[in-house]
Amino acid sequence: MSEGILFIISAPSGTGKSSLIQGLLKSKTLYNTRVSISHTTRIIRPGELHGKHYYFISKKEFEIMIKQEYFLEYAKVFSNYYGTSRKYIEKMLFSGIDVFLDIDWQGAKQIKCKMPKSKSIFLLPPSKDTLYKRLRERGQDSDSVIANRMEKAVDEMQHYSEYDYLIINDDFKQAVNDLITIITAEHLCLFHQKNKHNLLISNLLKC
């Protein structure tokens, strides 16, 4: 059995990253895909569940886990910690399951250094106006928080060229199809095909 592929997906807040990942999970793909559940110290939002969307823990707990080297990567965003469990990722990949990591560019850089075979995807909005509108429609943040998120979004988007793939989330269905295409392409690359069909290839090449 071949190992799963680790996919990193990053985007500014409000770009539709979470919706895109959920759209992928609901689609009929040929591959077993999971989303890594991160640990965070931020306050739980309405509709979120512990253990489903995030593992919500205290700052003290998070900092103890950092010292124990529990995280494959971690970062501080808007005064809150976010981190990815090393054991969870390794277990899923070894079981042949593709894993999606929803992390920012800082975390992506850490993962790329530690797991160079991982593939990274950056998601962009079709325009700044659209991004602003999406943030407003959430109805969760004040004007000052939205202004801060817009400013941070511009900074985050500067890093798009550090990624392997780029998706523009203008049309949702097309964006989901683009994501599925990326997954399919990676599974068809020589490295994964060779591992998956090693016995078949060996028999074909016998004299």
Swiss-Prot record:
A Pfam family assignment: Guanylate_kin
Annotated compartments: Cytoplasm
Domain of life: Bacteria
GO cellular component, as recorded: cytosol
Extent of the signal sequence: none
Reactions performed catalytically: GMP + ATP = GDP + ADP
Domain Guanylate kinase-like: 4-184
Function of the molecule: Essential for recycling GMP and indirectly, cGMP.
The protein's name in its UniProt record: Guanylate kinase
Taxonomic source organism: Buchnera aphidicola subsp. Acyrthosiphon pisum (strain APS) (Acyrthosiphon pisum symbiotic bacterium)
